Swiss-Prot record:
Further facts: May be derived from an ancient transposon that has lost its ability to translocate.
Species annotation: Bos taurus
The protein's name: Protein FAM200C
Highest taxon in the source lineage: Eukaryota
Gene Ontology CC entries for this record: nucleoplasm
């Protein structure tokens, strides 16, 4: 077998580059005519002969002139035809693809260098042989390389999103929320919703730390600086949906004042998905005390490792399958899971454990009145969890969310009427535990007071209600009564014309509401604009909550110094990096550095 010749970078002076076959054989390719030669021709005399005979009319053939020669447009297709690829191209592509998968799976950057590459080399050695192993060894997968690749892909994705924002025919919607990471650093996360082509798109925008304080002005400065940095006017934002402390992101906060001063037309909405905070604010004293008792019991069991282990051992001892007791000290968190239901269902076992540990919490916990209050809270929070779950999805708009809230609040009068008759059908845990008329009378009075206050708070805080009659054509332009639209309202003519189209009716019946109005943008721009200005704003901060879950994966004790915005963007963005463009730019930079 003849010896395989190796590529030498000095061969570029003859206007050749190197391509590599699938088996690793290197072959010269002329960048002027795109001809690919055999490995035996990989020698100066052969390359020089081809250049002089075929391209002798081109003046100058040194390295500097080669750098400025345009690569033929069909080069990539030619390489595919021959089953070959530039070795440097292939190595870069493999490196970027691995970094992309690493970010998507939320793995640490070091996993490639410490685990994946060593495993791949061992497999290649055993299955494919030493040549394949040597080839894999050249793929750059160090910690720094993976970090750099993710940063580059993140910037490409961000650039795509920014281009979409600039091209959006309507103002965009922003979703903004704040959380605290494991280092007690406040992180501000934002998502954006905009129109691209014929659909409404939701994309990750940024996750940045609040460097100084968590005041509303600091949030606004970070929010504004992001748009200024990327040369986008802040008035591109048509709405902002926030969730957080009233001092920072509330409707009357400094943040809202700053935003409205900068962008007067902007619409500020509060997240509709977590109404549980209102429940705790409206609880009568006895119900609030019961909730605090639950928190203290959880902290007693889970807040100390020995108690937690003893709790688990106690369950095993009495022959009951151990159920993990969820843990958090804040009221708001209690609403997000089924913790109150778990506490109610495990009440007797927990009570025995508190006795076993001689805890001073046992008196309040085993009290019958406490258990009645706990049953009501478990039932109510279960209703709220179901309401929240129905709104926790992508694409949720303010119209749909308010309809769900309105439907929920409209149940209150029916619940109150049943409660007055000592009928606890809507509260099954409570119905199970209340046995005497006296117990029913006492809890009925407390529930009545609470539901009345809760209904009032819901209506005021979330502005519960349907669209006004004149705007309901947005939901169904075909069944809508045109008499509700003022004759001076110009879109009335467009509505009449739209209703006459059988084709558009078919589209309405088969498409999502948002997609339908996006599709009408070219035919009925006024109607589409009015409808989409209502449908684009975010109704919840659900995407931010999902983003915070990713934040927990990336920001761990072993990766506490990591700048997470790039990793999170690559991990959760729906957009795919433009690998060919990134690699091409990378190669151009490498050539310029020669």
């Amino acid at each position: 077998m003849s010896k395989k010749r190796k590529w030498d970078d000095d061969y570029v002076r003859y206007w050749f580059t190197c391509v590599t076959e699938i088996d690793g054989t290197q072959r010269p390719q002329c960048v002027l005519c795109n001809s690919v030669f055999s490995n035996a021709d990989l020698r100066p005399s052969k390359l020089s002969d081809h250049f002089n005979r075929q391209h002798g009319g081109i003046g100058g053939h040194d390295l500097s002139s080669l750098k400025h020669v345009p690569v033929p447009a069909d080069q990539s297709e030619t390489l595919k035809t021959f089953g070959v690829a530039s070795q440097e191209d292939a190595l870069l592509q493999a490196s970027y693809q691995f970094a992309y998968l690493c970010a998507k799976e939320k793995n640490p950057h070091t996993i490639a260098e410490k685990l994946v590459k060593p495993c791949a080399l061992e497999i290649a050695q055993i299955v494919l042989g030493p040549d394949a192993q040597k080839k894999l060894q050249q793929v750059p997968l160090s910690d720094d390389v993976i970090h750099s690749r993710i940063d580059e892909m993140s910037q490409d994705i961000l650039q795509q999103v920014l281009e979409d924002i600039k091209a959006s025919p309507l103002k965009v919607g922003i979703q903004l929320a704040e959380t605290t990471d494991m280092d007690d650093c406040s992180q501000l996360m934002a998502f954006v919703r905009y129109i691209r082509e014929r659909e409404i798109v939701e994309e990750f925008l940024f996750c940045e730390p609040l460097q100084l304080t968590m005041k509303g002005k600091d949030v606004f400065n970070l929010f504004r600086d992001f748009f200024l940095k990327h040369k986008i006017a802040l008035d591109v934002c048509g709405s902002v949906c926030t969730d957080g402390a009233s001092s920072m992101l509330g409707e009357n906060s400094e943040f809202v004042c700053c935003v409205k001063k900068e962008v007067p037309h902007i619409v500020i909405t509060h997240c509709l998905v977590n109404p549980h905070t209102l429940v705790t604010k409206t609880l009568p004293t006895k119900l609030r005390d019961a909730l605090f008792t639950v928190v203290r019991v959880i902290n007693f069991i889970k807040g100390r490792a020995p108690n937690h282990r003893l709790f688990q051992a106690f369950f095993e001892e009495i022959g009951i399958e151990y159920s993990v007791l969820l843990f958090h000290t804040e009221m708001r968190w209690l609403s997000r899971g089924q913790i109150l239901t778990h506490i109610f269902e495990m009440h007797e076992e927990i009570n025995q454990f508190l006795h076993h540990q001689s805890s001073n919490l046992v008196d309040g916990f085993e009290n019958k009145e406490f258990k009645i209050h706990l049953a009501y809270l478990a039932d109510l929070f279960k209703h709220l969890n179901e309401l929240s779950a129905s709104m926790q999805r992508t694409g949720m708009n303010t119209v749909s969310a308010r309809e769900k809230l309105s439907a929920f609040v409209r149940k209150f009068p029916f619940w109150l009427k049943r409660i007055e008759k000592r009928n606890f059908t809507n509260f099954p845990f409570l119905e199970e535990i209340v046995v005497s008329d006296n117990e029913a009378l006492c809890i009925a009075a407390e529930i009545t007071l609470h539901l009345q206050q809760l209904s009032s708070f819901f209506n005021g805080y979330f502005s519960v209600g349907d669209l006004d009659e004149a705007s309901k054509w947005i939901l169904d332009p075909f069944l809508f009564n045109l008499d509700f639209v003022d004759d001076g309202y110009l879109v009335k003519n467009d509505l009449a014309e739209l209703r006459a189209s059988g084709q558009i009716l078919m589209e309405f019946e088969t498409m999502k509401l948002e997609d339908f109005w996006c599709a009408q943008f070219t035919v009925f721009p006024s109607l589409a604009k009015t409808a989409l200005e209502i449908l684009i704003p975010f109704a919840t901060t659900y995407l931010c909550e999902l983003g915070f879950s990713s934040l927990l994966h990336f920001k761990t004790k072993s990766r506490s110094c990591l700048n997470m915005s790039d990793d999170i963007r690559v991990a959760i963005s729906k957009k795919v990096p433009r690998f060919s463009d990134i690699i091409e730019q990378k190669l151009q930079l490498q050539q310029k550095s020669l």
